[in-house]
């Protein structure tokens, strides 16, 4: 079965960096869903306060069902992350693994 990578790239307000790091730490501890193989956050080299979250799902079905599995605390943290980002900086990418190569 082919995997799915979902990424969210954004910039945060520089004065909110410490708050951002604590929210992401809690989010990493709470993110557990069927079919979610991994979740990682990276800082983009050469771009201060620019980050990318990468979710790896075991299948397209697991990716499609991901929103259904979220609890209230996760939703609060995700909304808080949205409040910390700079306006118009968020970019979403979804990649489907090629299994025939």
State what each model feature region is.
Residues 4-10, 52:
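Active-site-flanking beta-strand signature of metal-NTP-handling nucleotidyl enzymes
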Residues 28-52:
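Short, glycine- and small/hydrophobic-rich beta-strand elements in well-ordered beta-sheets
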Residues 1-4, 100-101:
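Short, Lys/Arg-enriched, disordered terminal segments
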Residues 11-22:
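Short, surface-exposed ligand-recognition loops at beta-strand->loop->(often short) alpha-helix junctions
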Residues 30-38, 56-92:
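An amphipathic, aromatic/His-enriched active-site/gating alpha helix that lines ligand/cofactor pockets
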Residues 92-101:
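Short, low-order "capping/linker" segments at domain edges
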Residues 13-15, 46, 58-60:
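Short coil/turn motifs at secondary-structure junctions
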């Amino acid at each position: 079965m082919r995997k799915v990578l979902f990424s969210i790239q954004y910039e945060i307000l520089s004065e909110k960096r410490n708050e951002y790091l604590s929210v992401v730490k809690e989010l990493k501890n709470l993110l557990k869903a069927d079919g979610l193989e991994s979740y990682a956050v990276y800082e983009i080299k050469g771009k201060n306060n620019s980050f990318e979250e990468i979710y790896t799902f075991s299948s397209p079905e697991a990716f499609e069902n991901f929103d259904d599995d979220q609890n209230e605390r996760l939703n609060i943290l995700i909304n808080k992350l949205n409040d910390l980002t700079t306006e118009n900086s968020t970019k979403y990418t979804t990649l489907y693994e090629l299994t025939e190569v």
